[in-house]
Amino acid sequence: MGKDYYKILGIPSGANEDEIKKAYRKMALKYHPDKNKEPNAEEKFKEIAEAYDVLSDPKKRSLYDQYGEEGLKTGGGSSGGSGGSFHYTFHGDPHATFASFFGGSNPFDIFFASSRSTRPFSGFDPDDMDVDEDEDPFGAFGRFGFNGLSRGPRRAPEPLYPRRKVQDPPVVHELRVSLEEIYHGSTKRMKITRRRLNPDGRTVRTEDKILHIVIKRGWKEGTKITFPKEGDATPDNIPADIVFVLKDKPHAHFRRDGTNVLYSALISLKEALCGCTVNIPTIDGRVIPLPCNDVIKPGTVKRLRGEGLPFPKVPTQRGDLIVEFKVRFPDRLTPQTRQILKQHLPCS
């Protein structure tokens, strides 16, 4: 069953134009979200605006009276009657309808947003509100006129304070970066999707935004990059900060230890005992020959100074490239080789 617009406004189906306006004025003031804090007030307020939009327009009202809501929105009867070329959908902003009805202003702004504007409310007369005595839309604020003078001794005025907005907690994302990006510095582009307030300050839209994250040379894992108030916005909150936390990507050759870079070099037992030269790759793509003339034991460490990552505060200085040696032992030895080793290797 479709909506009963007459019932929504509380008027009979034969109501005239003045009665429709009077009913809209009464119901819109009663259910305006600035006054009515019931959970369904916003939806009811929108229904009232839709009902007024239809019944205040002779063409829409005629189609509605003939075919009901469904007929109105589908273009009339299924046989293609006089309304067959007309299709109705309510796309309006109920708050805009409300403000337009009262001469382009929201009468509740005197209570809820007086700090935003001091201009008079053109076309709005509080005495023109035809509402029941017990349904006074401004009853919660005392019987005060718009010039600040009391209209009667009904209630004492109550102080009003704007509701204090609280910022949402930060939205944290992990941002993985390679050691090369840390070495050279880089800029990453991250797309976020968030809700933002429309100019009316009430409704929201969904939009995408590209955040440019500048990663400076030598930044440590765990460094936080914050974009203030780039989170979701609603009429009742302060948007959250968007925070990116750096996390090192696993690397094929290196591990990170602060500004030092660790590299594991695997050599044979022969190379460990007899000496060798090992080619060591660097974080910037070069190769450094490292002579090893002494016996290399498993776990031996050699340090190439200044070949690590930049210091965050002094990027011209760098940490070290630390080479950790691993020795690959043979799986088996021939009897002849075993005998030769016994003859030549020291006992201790």
Swiss-Prot record:
One of its GO terms (molecular function) is unfolded protein binding. GO terms for biological process: negative regulation of transcription by RNA polymerase II; protein folding; response to unfolded protein. The keyword RNA-binding does not apply. Residues 4-68 form the J domain. Induction: Expressed under normal conditions, its expression can further be increased after various stress treatments. CDD domains: DnaJ, DnaJ_C. It holds the Pfam family DnaJ_C. One of its GO terms (cellular component) is cytosol. Signal peptide: none annotated. The keyword Transmembrane helix does not apply. Keywords: Chaperone. This is DnaJ homolog subfamily B member 5. The gene is Dnajb5.
